[in-house]
């Protein structure tokens, strides 16, 4: 990829200004539609559905909600229903039928404080086993919900009595390669990363990356854990090789100083798990490719398997805004199509070219 023209290009296809603070955006599976959620100036929440039509984002519907909506996922919904699960500033977990979004089809008082982050698995053809939703909150707890079970979570990971409650900023499902196995990874404001094994309800691994963890994502949710990317406040991200866990050293990792400011999000390309995008606090996007080492594990001096980290190379970067890009979502259906939101109250649909050449 010597010539600049051979590199992937990041093209702003559609820009749409809105009159509220945008917190999250998600493509609606199997459609040219996406949903945006956020906070109106008067303190209520808003849920909007847009459709791409002739190079424009056309607003199809808008619904106001009592509390600002912080995050959303389709990950626990079937392809037929495509229900959106959201977390709001009041600690409520709601599931919405976007065809009739006035009242939720499921509602639970999930947390005592704001739900910062949400993820889903077991739906939209991703991950074996039951559909589940995980939420993380400022109240320090991480809870796993089965949308078929009302009111009570199926798992609750909270600090032990006497331990300080840390603000949970990001959660991610992974390792859902059969009906029994499933893991949740959570990142906290003090730099802690904790990997919870949901099958035997234990903390499988924990580490600290010294700065608040803004975003976590496995490269795939529905395979044996392969890679995990964690982004942080000080412009760094870390890629952990999750295939080999050393008893004392944990997982091997490589870190990159990606941005000059907070790395708000990381999102892997659904069609190629070694390509991922990071979004920054200065309104920029960086597209990366992970290169594996010649050998992913080796024996240490005691003869124990230890992981070997690879490297991340920058493919392209672009500045779209002066404000942080707070959310980003790749289209699961159309390779290279993505939607992102920024605190400049603009939602942008982007096209990333030449991804099939990587």
From Swiss-Prot:
The terms under GO molecular function for this entry are: ubiquitin binding
**Residues of the signal peptide:** none
Coiled-coil region(s) at which residues? none
Q: Which Gene3D superfamilies match?
A: YVTN repeat-like/Quinoprotein amine dehydrogenase
GO CC terms for this protein? dynein axonemal particle
Q: Where are the WD repeats?
A: 64-106, 116-155, 163-206, 208-250, 258-298, 320-358
Annotated Pfam families: WD40
Which organism was this protein described from? Xenopus laevis (African clawed frog)
Q: Where are the transmembrane segments?
A: none
What protein name is recorded for this chain?
A: Dynein axonemal assembly factor 10
GO BP terms, alphabetized: apoptotic process; axonemal dynein complex assembly
Question: Where does the record place it?
Answer: Dynein axonemal particle
| PANTHER family the UniProt entry points to | MRNA EXPORT FACTOR AND BUB3 (PTHR10971)
Q: Which SMART domains match?
A: WD40
- Key words, A-Z: Apoptosis, Cytoplasm, Repeat, WD repeat
Look up the domain of life of the source.
Eukaryota
Q: How does it assemble?
A: Interacts with PIH1D1; the interaction associates DNAAF10 with the R2TP complex. Interacts with several dynein axonemal assembly factors.
Q: What is this protein for, i.e. what is its function? A: Key assembly factor specifically required for the stability of axonemal dynein heavy chains in cytoplasm.
